[in-house]
């Protein structure tokens, strides 16, 4: 039976011009096997028909309410939804995603059975007809599944779990008692980071289950993660998180380095995402922020890999030098690697060294070879560090197997080129050369 005063789960759906996806999203919520829910659609005055669609749903199902936001801010919309929610737990569904029919029944069942403030599950990423299962916990943390934890018991929840909020439910008392709110910056950019960090910092009981319910879209061309114009959003969000820690001195000493770690991951992602004309200015902000973090002794090098630390020190020391030496070819590198098997083969050290060997056509070039070889190997190692850092924080960006590329057969032919064969032989037996 539906309890209209206190439903089991209040589901907030912030929306703005989501007409292509909104019906699939709302239908998946209304069809939940858990019927005792309320749906709060917080629309920021959509102009593409989304608002009209939501109002039609509101007429047909009294569990759904449409609330108009006077600000186009994801954080403001979410805060409005949290304020209006009457439920025991909070759920979130983004307006371009959808969920499996048993999601909230299962999460609520686990939450009640284990008396948990937070329950999160695995999820799916889908794009262009392909779907991938993603674990909320990384391999090194899989032993945390099906146990009540918090960061005091196991700091790995901050290091090895996915920060996506809609894949879970959250006891509303936790948010209200601790006055947890999202940053109300304009648009939709990174505000979910602050919500995740606050919840994980303050929750006493978090539970992860090895089941997936949430369908996360990655082919929406209007998604904020694809915007090349939003430059400083990550900076503003991690300043917001750092201000939160200042208000909680009992958390600050331990969690400030965690904040710095995630700031780094998001800054690196921003560097890859934003338009070329903004990169140098962003690197200057990157340098400024991490110089302060280092000065305040808030950076725990044990949380970072050697490559990560070299990147940080390079940017802090000279952001302009980092930009001119590395960023130009790194942008080209990522574009080529993700869209061609042939480029993947040409990126390999065997091919690159082989090409240097083939170009040795006169005594001057032979004399220059050791220096060129040193630079090529140095560049290759740095590119590998950039790639490893990216997939460390965004595992879904890991390169697919070569055979999945459309030019796979052409790539195999490149392996038979003299340049590749020579380079491979050089790597295996450099003394012979």
Task: Show which residues each predicted segment covers.
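Donor-binding/catalytic cores of nucleotide-activated saccharide
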Residues: 74, 78, 98-210, 214-231
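Short aromatic/hydrophobic "clamp" motif used to bind/position activated sugar donors
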Residues: 90
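Membrane-interface aromatic/basic loop that binds lipid-linked glycans or pyrophosphate carriers
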Residues: 116, 276-344, 412-414, 421, ...
């Amino acid at each position: 039976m539906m309890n209209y005063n206190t439903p089991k789960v209040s589901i907030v759906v912030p929306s703005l011009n989501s007409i292509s996806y909104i019906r699939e999203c709302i239908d998946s919520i209304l069809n939940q096997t858990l019927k005792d829910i309320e749906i709060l659609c917080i629309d920021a005055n959509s102009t593409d028909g989304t608002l009209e669609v939501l109002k039609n749903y509101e007429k047909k199902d009294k569990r759904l309410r449409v609330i108009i936001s006077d600000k186009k801010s994801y954080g403001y919309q979410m805060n409005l939804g949290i304020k209006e929610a009457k439920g025991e737990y909070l759920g979130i569904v983004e307006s371009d995603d959808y969920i499996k029919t048993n999601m909230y029944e299962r999460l609520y069942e686990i939450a009640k059975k284990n008396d948990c403030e937070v329950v999160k599950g695995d999820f799916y990423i889908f794009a262009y007809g392909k779907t991938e299962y993603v674990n909320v916990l990384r391999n090194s943390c899989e032993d945390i599944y099906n146990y009540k934890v918090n960061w005091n018991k196991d700091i790995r929840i901050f290091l090895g779990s996915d920060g996506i909020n809609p894949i879970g439910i959250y006891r509303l008392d936790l948010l209200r008692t601790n006055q947890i709110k999202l940053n109300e910056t304009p648009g939709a950019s990174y505000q979910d980071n602050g919500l995740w960090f606050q919840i994980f910092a303050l929750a006493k009981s978090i539970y992860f289950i090895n089941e997936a319910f949430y369908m996360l879209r990655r082919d929406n061309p209007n998604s904020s993660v694809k915007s090349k114009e939003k430059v400083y959003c990550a900076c503003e969000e991690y300043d917001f998180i750092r201000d939160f820690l200042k208000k909680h001195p009992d958390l600050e000493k331990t969690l400030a380095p965690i904040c710095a770690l995630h700031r780094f991951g998001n800054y690196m992602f921003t560097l890859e995402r934003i338009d070329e004309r903004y990169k140098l200015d962003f690197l200057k902000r990157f340098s400024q922020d991490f110089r302060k973090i280092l000065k305040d002794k808030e950076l725990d090098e044990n949380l970072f890999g050697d490559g990560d630390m070299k990147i940080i020190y390079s940017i802090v020391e000279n952001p302009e030098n980092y930009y001119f030496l590395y960023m130009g070819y790194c942008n080209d590198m990522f574009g080529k690697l993700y869209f061609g098997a042939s480029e993947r083969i040409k990126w390999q050290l065997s091919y690159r060294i082989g090409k240097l060997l083939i170009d040795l056509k006169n005594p001057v070039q032979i004399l220059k070879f050791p220096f060129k070889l040193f630079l090529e190997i140095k560049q290759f190692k740095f590119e590998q560090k950039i790639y490893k850092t990216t997939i460390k924080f965004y595992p879904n960006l890991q390169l697919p197997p070569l055979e999945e590329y459309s030019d796979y057969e052409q790539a195999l032919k490149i392996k038979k080129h003299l340049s590749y064969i020579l380079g491979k032989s050089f790597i295996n037996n450099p003394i012979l050369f």
